[in-house]
């Protein structure tokens, strides 16, 4: 058994890990199963989110929603990180959304801008809930790594609001799903 681990399993894990590091998802992402919306414009940058829902969901009824924020150390990453999770949750009746936000490698920003963008995304979702078939009182947020930080921060920290937004619309999610 030890020989198998040394000769097959461990080298396989190494190769797969190395391949994962080298594989860079394209940016901006292409997600043909989703509808794409611009939720915020900052200078020349349009921040987008991708909404996944089944055809049945677009025809009436209010459904719970979740918005995912990608990981990447506040430096990089792609909203496509949560594409599969969005597809799965949409197939189960939720409206699932993955959002872009500003990161340092593309926008020369700090982590505080990520939190501002996360709050803007939740606010946009609530503001557009009726046209998306979403129950505006059942909006969850989730993310992995830096994206988990964004989700946790928008749920717990006051401030970091973008100018010109309607602060009467809550930017706090009703539930959280945080990874690592």
Language-model regions: role of each:
Residues 120-180:
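Primarily recognizes the serine-hydrolase "nucleophile elbow" in alpha/beta-hydrolase
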Residues 9-19:
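Bacterial N-terminal signal peptides
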Residues 65, 93-100:
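A fold-wide structural signal in alpha/beta-hydrolase
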Residues 37, 81-84, 103, 109-118, ...:
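Mature catalytic domains of secreted/periplasmic carbohydrate-active enzymes
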Residues 61-71:
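Short beta-strand element of the alpha/beta-hydrolase
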Residues 78-79, 85, 99-136:
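Catalytic nucleophile-loop/oxyanion-hole region of alpha/beta-hydrolase
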Residues 24-60:
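N-terminal cap/lid segment of alpha/beta-hydrolase-fold proteins
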Residues 1-10:
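Bacterial N-terminal signal peptides that target proteins for export
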